[in-house]
Amino acid sequence: MTVEYKKRLLHLLLDLGEAMLTTGAEVNRVEDTLSRMGQAYGAEKMNVFVITSSIVVTMSFSEGDEYTQTRRIQKPIGTDFQKLEQLNALSRKCCEQVLDLQDLEKSIHTSCQETKDRTYTHIGSILAAGSFAIFFGGTFADGIIAA
């Protein structure tokens, strides 16, 4: 493995970790996923530390070289279980059969690019607001105004 390959791998692992974290994955899951993927790609030892605003990854290889990189997470953390499931499936696939880095990069960015249809979210918000207004003693007109 070349130095450039290892650096690119580390960068892609951070991309994956950031994508998982910002779509709602818990911190332990991100740490475990990045550790397993790094070892699947040839790292002898992985040291991964994740909090909601930062990811630190150190990869140690059998040749004796180590690479460390930190990524600050500034994107808002939301919940998108569909994207999270795609990223989890990608990580499982990579642990079973190692993908080429170019394919890995394409898969990560494809999963992150897909946009979520917010129509159902808006309809649900309207129904919830109107229902709560009526539930807490408002009239039907209050429910419509709240929606």
What are these regions (language model features)?
Residues 1-98:
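Soluble N-terminal domains of membrane-associated systems
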Residues 92-101, 142, 146-147:
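Short secondary-structure transition/capping segments
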